[in-house]
């Protein structure tokens, strides 16, 4: 595919800690249920999986927030559980319940049968990447993503989201050998999956370690970060003549920033509990930082949104040799008023231009 020249590469340059005229912004879950147009497309698709597995629908919803807002990146519309679904675990989205697996990994035999899926079974994802790149026509970069080996293992063992992670933590303490096997398969599958996204046209990739923060210190390094590092180490880092930056986001991972920064990634995503300035001091500008507004700020009205945006930018401080991509500290709430996002994007761009000019 001969890709259109990138018209706005501020996001990619910020991830690589290169000079930029303003702080770029995109939002986790920016294509989602807070947008009426997303809900209309999902209704046409019939279900979440009907949306995610149809490249044209996936492209349509990926591009919707960019039609509304002056965002600096698009992120592929998909789900972190597509990989275990391709492994045969039977993903289903029950109304009001979230994702669940029909065949979770509970026994030694279940784990023994687990294998890296044929990437052709995920062709719909790579086709969506190609369609989105074509339709973006170089407007902004496209981010590909996957769940971290640990985070998808949580769903694969629990069978659904969990409050206490009892089943996977039972396996971790009682049969760590089984969990390590799951994580090894997940790491290989995730690496192949992200590299296929890059080959299809993703210009940056992000690993979502959404549940890394539920692990005890020491166990996080052993069961989450070690496998994240394996994925990052194998990523294609140059494609179509450009560096492909890698972002790692561990929700609740603030105490491990130094270790995460050393995993080989270009940028760390931060949740809203972390002070950006302190995170920057602790990582010494070795990586860019992404984040980290509390998503609930978007319910506070124009004045609060703009004040918190400025506070977040000020916390990072003068960019200098660092890199900052503005984002939320977690995914945007489905109840967010769409006009709140317009206020946020405007304030980040306007205020950061003045900061970058200093």
Swiss-Prot record:
Binding site for substrate: 29-33, 79, 155, 210, 330
Catalysed reactions listed for this entry: uroporphyrinogen III + 4 H(+) = coproporphyrinogen III + 4 CO2
Pfam family, one: URO-D
EC numbers, comma separated: 4.1.1.37
Functional note: Catalyzes the decarboxylation of four acetate groups of uroporphyrinogen-III to yield coproporphyrinogen-III.
Biological process according to GO: protoporphyrinogen IX biosynthetic process from glutamate
Subcellular location, record wording: Cytoplasm
Subunit structure, interactors included: Homodimer.
Coiled coil ranges: none
Entry protein name: Uroporphyrinogen decarboxylase
């Amino acid at each position: 595919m001969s890709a259109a020249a990138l018209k706005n590469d501020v996001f990619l340059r910020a991830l690589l800690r290169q000079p930029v005229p303003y702080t770029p912004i995109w939002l986790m879950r920016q294509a989602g249920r807070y947008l009426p147009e997303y809900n209309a497309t999902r209704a046409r698709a019939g279900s979440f999986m009907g949306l995610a597995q149809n490249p044209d629908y996936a492209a349509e919803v990926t591009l919707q927030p960019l039609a509304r807002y002056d965002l600096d990146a698009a992120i592929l519309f998909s789900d972190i559980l597509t990989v275990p679904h391709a492994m045969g675990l039977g993903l289903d989205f029950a109304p009001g319940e979230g994702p669940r697996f029909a065949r979770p990994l509970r026994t030694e035999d279940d784990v023994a049968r687990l294998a890296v899926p044929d990437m052709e079974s995920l062709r719909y994802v790579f086709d969506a990447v190609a369609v989105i790149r074509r339709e973006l026509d170089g407007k902004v970069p496209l981010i590909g993503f996957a769940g971290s080996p640990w985070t998808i293992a949580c769903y694969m063992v629990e069978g659904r989201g969990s409050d206490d992670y009892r089943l996977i933590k039972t396996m971790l303490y009682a049969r760590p050998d089984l969990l390590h096997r799951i994580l090894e398969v997940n790491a290989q599958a995730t690496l192949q999956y992200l590299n296929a996204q890059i080959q299809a046209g993703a210009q940056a990739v992000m690993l979502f370690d959404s549940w890394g923060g539920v692990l005890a210190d020491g166990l996080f390094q052993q069961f989450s970060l070690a496998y994240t590092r394996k994925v990052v180490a194998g990523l294609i880092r140059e494609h179509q003549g450009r560096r492909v930056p890698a972002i790692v986001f561990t929700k609740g991972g603030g105490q491990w920033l130094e270790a995460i920064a050393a995993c080989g990634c270009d940028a760390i995503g931060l949740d809203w509990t972390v002070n950006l300035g302190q995170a920057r001091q602790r990582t010494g500008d070795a990586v860019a930082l992404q984040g980290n507004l509390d998503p609930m700020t978007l319910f506070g009205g124009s004045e609060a949104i703009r004040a918190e945006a400025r506070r977040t930018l000020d916390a990072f401080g003068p960019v200098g040799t660092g890199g900052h991509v503005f984002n939320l500290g977690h995914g945007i709430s489905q109840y967010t008023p769409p006009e709140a996002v317009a206020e946020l994007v405007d304030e980040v761009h306007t205020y950061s231009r003045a900061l970058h000019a200093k």
